[in-house]
From Swiss-Prot:
The keyword Coiled coil does not apply. Residues 279-397 form the xRRM domain. SUPFAM superfamilies: Winged helix' DNA-binding domain. Its main location: nucleus. Keywords: Chromosome, Nucleus, RNA-binding, Telomere. It comes from the Eukaryota. It comes from Euplotes aediculatus. This is La-related protein 7 homolog.
């Protein structure tokens, strides 16, 4: 299969390309035909090839509107070499290659076109047209935006589920967000109608799953078991060919036809309810003691570094209570620490008092202990959080705005009024800050 142009692939390609051209130019006759004024003409060839590959790469075409228009102007997606000779980077590379002869040959572009044709010959991503006057991609450029391609791909990190589990999840994926015009019904399986998997377990750290539409990614996220996954992340990755997608669909249909039970991959309501209850349980809390006097909350957050907690209770004392979103994040945080200690930066006054004989860490940082919290303190904090949430809910109920009261005033001054939702959010945030105070 022909590959898309990627910057990482181009970087990896450079040494191989250089070795190839350096061996071909080791002969004196081969170097003389290039009419080069530089000492090492073979160095310019891989540089120029790499630059041309970058111009036609997905990463550049999504950002460079001028070159994208030239590529999409013709059906072949070709760009004339004479147009590329106008680019500053190409001119500087040609000047580096030809040296003094560059000024003599500047009036005639035929010599430069021949040299660029020589550079394109060994490329994996671009090629010459039949008339050898233009360059085009080996694989056609997809005219969709980069944001769309990012939204079509899901990356699964953390504890990776098995291939079997992912296949069942894709097969049992239900189109919950289907439109009225779509053939699929809300409770009917998609049957791989526009859904395919790009790769399975090729990497030891993550799995990529590609979809043809953005709503299929959301559908897959809803139908996948929440216990099997620690992190969903949209990753920029171009789609594979439709031919390969069709083959993958047929393969998956054969492998998954034996699975009937969808309870493994569907949403488990018990797990979700337990997670919501677990958000306000004792297993989500930790206590930090021996904190330097006068420390602030942001200093504690910086010391915790990874998996920052969603809540910190600290009132300028030596102890602080931190709460994570769930127990999984708490255990992950404890596992990432070799010991039960964290380092918090001391204040300037305390640092000045310390002697110079101490090490850098002992002078500028203080080691604080991580301890378990007792049940009574946890219940007290949970009650405070619930009271705060209920007060915010009451504020939301009071701030239900009647559309009749707020008539649009664009008729009078010619400007649009802010939507009701934005006015609501602004008022809720203002009231919630007052409640916290």
């Amino acid at each position: 299969m022909e590959m898309d142009i990627d910057l990482d692939d181009i970087e990896n390609l450079l040494p191989n390309t250089f070795n190839k051209y350096s061996s071909s130019c080791s002969d004196k006759k081969g170097c003389k035909t290039l009419k080069s004024g530089s000492k090492s003409p073979s160095l310019t060839i891989p540089k120029l090839q790499k630059q041309l590959e970058f111009y036609f790469s997905d990463a550049n075409l999504y950002n460079d509107s001028f070159l994208r228009k030239l590529v999409l102007k013709s059906g072949e997606q070709r760009v004339e070499i004479e147009t590329l000779l106008m680019f500053k980077k190409i001119r500087s590379l040609l000047k580096e290659h030809y040296g003094e002869n560059y000024l003599i040959l500047k009036a005639n572009n035929d010599e430069y076109i021949k040299f660029i044709c020589e550079c394109v010959k060994g490329s994996r991503y671009i090629r010459l047209t039949k008339d050898k006057l233009a360059i085009k991609r080996k694989k056609k450029f997809d005219n969709r935006t980069a944001e769309e391609l990012i939204a079509f791909t899901i990356r699964i990190d953390g504890e990776l589920p098995s291939l079997e589990t992912i296949e069942k999840a894709v097969y049992n994926c239900r189109n919950r967000s289907s439109e009225s015009s779509d053939v699929n019904k809300p409770n009917k399986p998609c049957k791989f109608n526009g859904i395919y998997v790009k790769s399975f377990g090729t990497n030891a750290h993550c799995i990529y799953i590609g979809f043809l539409k953005h709503r299929y990614t959301e559908c897959f996220r809803d139908c996948f078991s929440l216990q099997q996954i620690t992190c969903f992340d949209y990753s920029c990755s171009s789609l594979i060919s439709l031919k390969e997608a069709g083959e993958m669909k047929r393969r998956l249909k054969k492998e998954i036809s034996k699975f009937v039970d969808s309870s493994v991959t569907g949403i488990n309501n018990k797990n979700i309810s337990n997670e919501k209850e677990e958000e306000l349980s004792q297993s989500c809390f930790l206590k930090i003691s021996k904190i330097p006097a006068g420390s602030k909350k942001y200093q504690i957050r910086e010391a915790l570094d990874c998996d920052r907690p969603s809540y910190i209770q600290y009132d300028d004392k030596e102890t602080a209570v931190i709460r994570f979103k769930n127990s999984a994040m708490r255990t992950k945080f404890l596992e990432s620490r070799n010991g039960a200690e964290i380092l918090i930066k001391k204040n300037c006054v305390d640092i000045a008092k310390e002697s110079n004989s101490k090490s850098f860490v002992n002078k500028y940082y203080q080691s604080c202990l991580i301890e378990e919290i007792d049940e009574a303190t946890a219940q007290k904090i949970i009650k405070e959080i619930k009271d705060q949430r209920s007060s915010i809910d009451e504020i939301k109920a009071e701030l239900k705005l009647d559309n009749k009261k707020y008539k649009p005033w664009s008729k009078y001054c010619g400007r649009k009024r802010r939507p009701v939702s934005k006015r609501k959010n602004k008022a809720i945030n203002k009231m919630s800050t007052e409640v916290k105070k």
